[in-house]
Amino acid sequence: MRRREFIAFATSAIFASPRVFAQQSGKIWRVGFVAHRYEKFYDPLFAGLRELGYVEGQNLVVERRYAEGHAEHFKDIAQELVKLNVDAIIVVTTPAAMAARNETKTIPIIHPAAIDPVGTGLIASLAHPGGNVTGLAVLNAETSAKRVELMREVLPGISKGVVLWNSANPANSLAFRETESAGLKLGVKLLSQEVRSPKEFEAAFAAISSQHPDILIVVQDALTLEYRKEIIDFTLRNKLPSMFVGKEWVEEGGLMSYGDRLPERYRRAADLVDKVLRGAKPADIPVEQPTTFELAVNLRTARSMGLALSPAFLARADLVIE
């Protein structure tokens, strides 16, 4: 495995001495954390909070709640956290963010992976969010086009593919449309395959197989990300060349990914949590965007699929798993 240095999110100045504030305020902070299930790439968020002086068991209580792939549970989770009067709510998927915002207009909500937050109505604009939601946005148009371009570079003869996406997440509609549009511009027809819950994956896999696509592109959100093992196993069984967003997929056997790095995204979210705990209003905290992206390739998977990747292509990759 080799990795090239790359720059994470551009950071902005925060209030001075956050550790001193967190440790000397005398307050026990209570923060909600909402996801489908635990993932290791969330750890930098909590490590970042510790670095900033918020230590679980001392001055921080984290109320972790997991929906286990069932988005309909987010409403009850949000209501519970509001009743607990938490100081902030961290959400990792748009349906959870919308559920939380529907339950409270005062508790700060931090969304580290917001897809089209303006289009979904979570915020008014990236520069001036308004309301009680802020976080980090996911770029779609540019990166969606780049993923299709990379797949066509590896497989120049492709004409048909499938996009797997979670339609229960309203933010993903834009991600699918932009991916579909990018494919059309490159002469690749991309068909839609929706899932809305974990129980729908097997039927989705069967439907994809029946289409006999040249490639698969997966729209990443909390559901697809947290069920990536099942998706990767499907692509390996069927020798289906696939493109993902984060290197986590490639490290676990996926062919290729292009996107920003999740650990840095969640570490940066800790700084935003610190800001709101210190009194900053989410309405006044600009939603940040990634500035640098990485290409990851699993060479073992490529070989198992009979793909010969050129030295020039591999030289451009930030991460190559031999």
Regions found by a protein language model. Give the residues of each.
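Short hydrophobic alpha-helices and adjacent helix-cap/hinge residues
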Residues: 1-322
